[in-house]
Amino acid sequence: MIQGLTALNPAGKRVLLRCDLNVPLKDSGNGVKVISDDGRIRGSLPTIRELLSLGASVVIIAHLGRPKGEVKSELSLEVVARRLAELLERPVSFSSQIVGPEVLKEATALKSGEVLLLENIRFNASETSKDDGERLALAKELAKLGDLYVGDGFGAVHRKHASVFELAQLLPHAAGKLIAAEVAVLEKLTQSPERPYGVVLGGAKVSDKIGVISNLLDKVNILAIGGGMLFTFLAAQGKEIGKSLFEAESVELVKQLLDRAEKLGVRVLLPSDIWVAPAFANDSPSLVSADQIPSNQMGLDIGPESARAFASAINECATVFWNGPMGVFEFPNFASGTKIVAQALSEVSGLSVVGGGDSAAAVRALGFSDSDFGYISTGGGASLEYLEGKELPGLIALR
């Protein structure tokens, strides 16, 4: 059983808080990186505020991108510290260090109600090391900075990293409000969904979703497949997919999944029409039947008939989980499938869950707000691995 915040007594203590602040950045045009979606920062606010209200000081540990153990200025968390201070409406100190005497001095100087954000933890190669000893050594250095540990970075709980796994075991620990909420929603999806239960999957790679489909097949009533992964499904049915991306090595597995779905009575929805183009660009869209994609074209979105069919199926459901866009939503010509599915999801009267990563970015980019949906998960890979039935290191460590 994962312990909640009430298990700790943080008054007057320094709390090491592992957050997921891995936000997307974009170039503002003058070479300065700005945050394009602050959803993950906002997701961390309830736990930070709760700890501060309980009289703690908070040292935040987080990562940004994949610097691979090197200091990369474009992946500094300094820009995140500024945005966090705005959202918290209080100062947030930023340390350019991760461990060592300088940051120890900064941490021990914190007073109750103060916040310190450390530099990108992944600038230290030991954070993501495959060597248990290296990770433990870093965790021991980090443990010097606080009295208690709270894990709240749901987007990283599937990683066996020093600040997620080893550090939690060195200090009295608990799960933050975000992790508690994420686990409660995912438990409902895997253990007690209200029916009919629909799962809508998209995104580029079917290999990322095979485990999820396999684990959920005997739990769902409707499975709708869109995004780049749908072409592997069409190929498995022997259909012409033109220049569309697909994973030849997954075709046999997909055939097995389709057979199993049929035996279990799961309604599998595949698109009947596809928006195609001659190249991966926002140009020359044309609409074709899903079984007649020309050899010189590639599929970039589900067509309007398919989107309406998906929306209709979603409207029948009491529980819906969606992960992965229906098309290349970044191109306006190929965003309609994702938009129609998102709109249908926002109208579900039961539980609608948007599963992290690209899906969360897509709904925000298309003008929806978080409140339009029952729940938007902050964890892409973490949500999927949980739904696969895997044990996640960051959750094991919080027991």
Task: Say what each PLM segment does.
Residues M1-R399:
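Active-site loop-to-helix "anion-binding N-cap" substructures in soluble metabolic enzymes
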